[in-house]
């Protein structure tokens, strides 16, 4: 495969969703409560599909199974990552995700979920929940039972451009007024701890998963802070956010024309802002804010022209 795979996202309506995915990127969203864009997804709950080339119309899940050469003949049976855009028009539930070992045992062999967030935009006084203040499981449980959420939850002020690494076992929640790009393990397993006593459209409170959450949550909280590393490569600024066992994440900021080498691994790309073109072997591939693509393994040397920002990730 010698060309990028551009992808058609899948959209998810959520109790807490809004219209920012349409307003910021021009997507045709299904409703005024659209919370998630599954941009690069091969998950059974919603697989994105290829928009261009001979594989157009195929789901990413199909391509992963039928064309391992695109991905460098990987060992795993499951596409490892999931890239989302999230419109937190309201607060998300306070939740936690299991690690691989727990999910394999208790969630039908699924992957665990370590994730990360890049804050694309947010309101002036925006915050998120990352971690808690309990020292022991007994204290954690007591604070839940007494409803002492203000005393339990660790709140952090945020601004556009912030990056957060959220390992499995970390209590967390996005809060209202936040537009986020999320890169995560390919999992849809969530254990809700607190949902603000909200009801869904049927007037029912959403299910909580306190028992499972207590089994997987990290107590006391461990803050995984990653200091970004900035590199200048010609007309590109490369910010290295994280290189972990699960994924590596970068931001490529292009101003003009920047040359890149051939990468042995495949790359997942999302255009955050601006517009540009990827040039390989004399062929140009246009991309704009809201475009999502996969560069195949051993794609070859390429150039990006334009004024744009990409979030790039790989396993």
From Swiss-Prot:
* Highest rank taxon of the organism: Bacteria
Has the keyword Phosphoprotein been applied to this entry? no
NCBIfam families, per the entry: manA (TIGR00218)
Q: What does this protein do?
A: Seems to be involved in the degradation of glucomannan.
Q: Which GO terms describe its molecular function?
A: mannose-6-phosphate isomerase activity; zinc ion binding
Look up the EC number in the record and give it: 5.3.1.8
The record describes how the cofactor is bound as: Binds 1 zinc ion per subunit.
Q: What induces it?
A: Up-regulated by konjac glucomannan and by cellobiose and mannobiose, the possible degradation products of glucomannan. Repressed by glucose via the carbon catabolite repression system. Also repressed by GmuR.
CDD domains found in the cross-reference section: cupin_PMI_type_I_N_bac
The UniProt entry, under SUPFAM superfamilies, shows: RmlC-like cupins
Which controlled-vocabulary keywords does the entry list?
Carbohydrate metabolism, Isomerase, Metal-binding, Zinc
Q: Which family does it belong to?
A: Belongs to the mannose-6-phosphate isomerase type 1 family.
Q: What class of enzyme is it?
A: isomerase
Cross-referenced Gene3D superfamilies: Jelly Rolls
- Organism the protein comes from: Bacillus subtilis (strain 168)
Please write the reaction equations for the catalytic activity of this protein.
D-mannose 6-phosphate = D-fructose 6-phosphate
Q: Which cofactor does it need?
A: Zn(2+)
The UniProt annotation places Zn(2+) binding at: 95, 97, 115, 172
Disulfide-linked positions: none
What name does UniProt use for this protein? Answer: Probable mannose-6-phosphate isomerase GmuF
Q: Which example biological process does GO assign this protein?
A: carbohydrate metabolic process
- Which residues are annotated as active site? 192
């Amino acid at each position: 495969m010698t060309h990028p795979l551009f992808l058609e996202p899948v959209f998810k309506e959520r109790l807490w969703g809004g219209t920012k995915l349409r307003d910021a990127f021009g997507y045709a969203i299904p409703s005024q409560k659209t919370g998630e864009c599954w941009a690069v997804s091969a998950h059974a709950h919603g697989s994105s599909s290829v928009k261009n080339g001979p594989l157009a119309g195929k789901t990413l899940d199909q391509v992963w199974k039928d064309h391992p050469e695109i991905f460098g003949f990987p060992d795993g049976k499951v596409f490892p990552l999931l890239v989302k855009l999230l419109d937190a028009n309201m607060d998300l539930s306070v939740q936690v995700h299991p690690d691989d070992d727990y999910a394999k045992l208790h969630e039908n062999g699924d992957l665990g979920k370590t994730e990360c967030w890049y804050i694309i935009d947010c309101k002036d006084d925006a915050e998120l929940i990352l971690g808690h203040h309990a020292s022991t499981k007994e204290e954690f449980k007591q604070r839940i039972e007494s409803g002492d959420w203000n005393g339990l939850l660790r709140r952090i002020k945020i601004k556009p451009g912030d990056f957060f690494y959220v390992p499995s076992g970390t209590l967390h929640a996005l809060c209202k007024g936040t537009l986020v790009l999320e890169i995560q393990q390919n999992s849809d397993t969530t254990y809700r701890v607190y949902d603000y006593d909200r009801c869904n459209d049927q007037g029912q409170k959403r299910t909580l998963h306190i028992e499972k959450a207590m089994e997987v949550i990290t107590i006391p909280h461990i803050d995984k802070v990653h200091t970004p590393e900035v590199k200048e490569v010609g007309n590109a600024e490369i910010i290295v956010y994280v290189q972990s066992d699960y994924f590596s994440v970068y931001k490529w900021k292009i101003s003009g024309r920047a040359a890149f080498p051939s990468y042995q691994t495949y790359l997942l790309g999302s255009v955050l802002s601006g517009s540009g073109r990827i040039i390989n072997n004399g062929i140009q591939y246009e991309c704009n804010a809201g475009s999502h693509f996969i560069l195949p393994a051993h794609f070859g040397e390429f150039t990006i022209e334009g004024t744009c920002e990409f979030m790039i990730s790989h396993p």
